[in-house]
Amino acid sequence: MADAITVLTAIGITVLMLLMVISGTAMIVKELNPNDIFTMQSLKFNRAVTIFKYIGLFIYIPGTIILYATYIKSLLMKS
């Protein structure tokens, strides 16, 4: 059972990390000058970037805390 929990934890951390990277990239793209990039040329792309920006804003701090807590827990389990 411990192996299943470890695998699910690793999958969860990976998904959270990927979502944080995508959302962070969306925040960077959103903050750039719209005249210099292609963001405003596509309404669907702009909408997707906006959605990922809000997801990034809402999960950045809790996600970082969860990743840190999981890392500390794994260090304590090894000891």
Swiss-Prot record:
Keywords: Late protein, Membrane, Transmembrane, Transmembrane helix, Viral envelope protein, Virion
Keyword Transferase recorded: no
Ranges in the topological domain labelled Intravirion: 1-3, 69-79
Induction of synthesis: Expressed in the intermediate phase of the viral replicative cycle.
Membrane topology reported for the UniProt record: Multi-pass membrane protein
Subcellular location: Virion membrane
Virion surface compartment spans: 25-47
Residues that span the membrane, as ranges: 4-24, 48-68
Main location: virion
Family, as annotated: Belongs to the orthopoxvirus OPG081 family.
Role: Envelope protein.
Name of protein: Protein OPG081
Designated gene of the protein: OPG081
